[in-house]
């Protein structure tokens, strides 16, 4: 993927971004077996919705969408960064909550599958989810390989990593792509007219209908594409030892995100450290649900499709 990270911006550290207001949005399930998952309302148009009978009691997370501030008009670098984080962080948390709820439901269905209690509707939901996350349902059906692939892919992305890449790729929200195409992650497309043309090579930068779509699409890329298999393995490694998945650790696996390779990774880590973005990976959310149907399958590795 070609990166548009070349937008220049300063990287002085900020001193907090109203943590009391934002921290409750950040959640990470308690790994592993069973994960503690937060309940959410799906937001993206392509979201796989639950049947009413399968929804959890209580209201899920909801985000009131507000237009992006004019970050270019904020003259002080620290103020611009704080505004960018305070605006984007709840939207990242909402998409993560959606992913964690899909994961919770998948783990619940794994438990049912071990007792041969999956209904036809539940099997159809699993097939739909697997299709959405590019997981094959082979001749053996929902075997160990299927569950390993699915649970490596249907999972949240560390908020620090999402914030860092959005900051780098959009110049803290000031780039033309972010303003005109809601593209905060340098994501490209290759059909004529699919996005915003650029000079210097084939393809265009993808145009999104809003920042929510941009975040969801970015997370789907990390969660499904072969180029980011190492990131998913690193995330699962953290889960298996009971750690919160680390954005800094995942960033070190993103050699394929930019043609700059290791230099891009070094820059991500620099921005993450200087702006203390890793602090956003450890906040707790009090709304959790535990799944106790069955122990999760062995998840040491994601099978090759």
Residue spans of the language-model regions?
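Catalytic cores of secreted/periplasmic lytic hydrolases that degrade extracellular macromolecules
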Residues: 2-164, 168-305
């Amino acid at each position: 993927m070609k990166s548009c990270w070349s937008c220049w911006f300063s990287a002085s550290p900020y001193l907090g971004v109203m943590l009391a207001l934002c921290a409750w949005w950040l959640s990470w399930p308690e790994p592993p077996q069973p994960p503690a998952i937060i309940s959410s309302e799906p937001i993206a148009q392509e979201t796989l919705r639950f049947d009413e009978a399968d929804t959890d009691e209580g209201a899920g997370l909801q985000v009131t969408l507000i237009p992006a501030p004019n970050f270019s008009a904020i003259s002080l670098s620290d103020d611009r960064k704080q505004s960018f984080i305070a605006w984007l962080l709840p939207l990242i948390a909402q998409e993560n909550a959606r992913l964690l709820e899909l994961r919770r439901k998948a783990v619940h269905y794994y438990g049912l599958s071990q007792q041969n209690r999956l209904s036809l509707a539940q099997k159809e939901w699993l097939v739909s989810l697997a299709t959405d996350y590019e997981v094959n349902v082979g001749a053996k059906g929902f075997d160990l390989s299927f569950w390993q692939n699915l649970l490596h892919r249907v999972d949240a992305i560390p908020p620090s990593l999402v914030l860092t890449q959005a900051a780098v790729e959009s110049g803290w929200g000031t780039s033309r792509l972010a303003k005109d195409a809601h593209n905060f992650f340098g994501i490209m497309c290759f059909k004529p007219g699919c996005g915003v043309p650029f000079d210097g090579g084939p393809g265009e930068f993808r145009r999104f209908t809003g920042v929510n779509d941009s975040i969801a699409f970015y997370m789907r890329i990390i969660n499904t594409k072969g180029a980011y298999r190492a990131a998913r393995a690193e995330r699962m490694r953290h889960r298996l030892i009971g750690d919160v998945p680390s954005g800094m650790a995942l960033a070190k696996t993103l050699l394929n995100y930019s043609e700059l390779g290791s230099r891009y990774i070094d820059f991500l880590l620099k921005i993450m450290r200087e702006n203390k973005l890793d602090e956003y990976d450890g906040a707790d959310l009090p709304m959790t649900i535990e799944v106790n149907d069955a122990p999760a399958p062995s998840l040491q590795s994601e099978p090759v499709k």
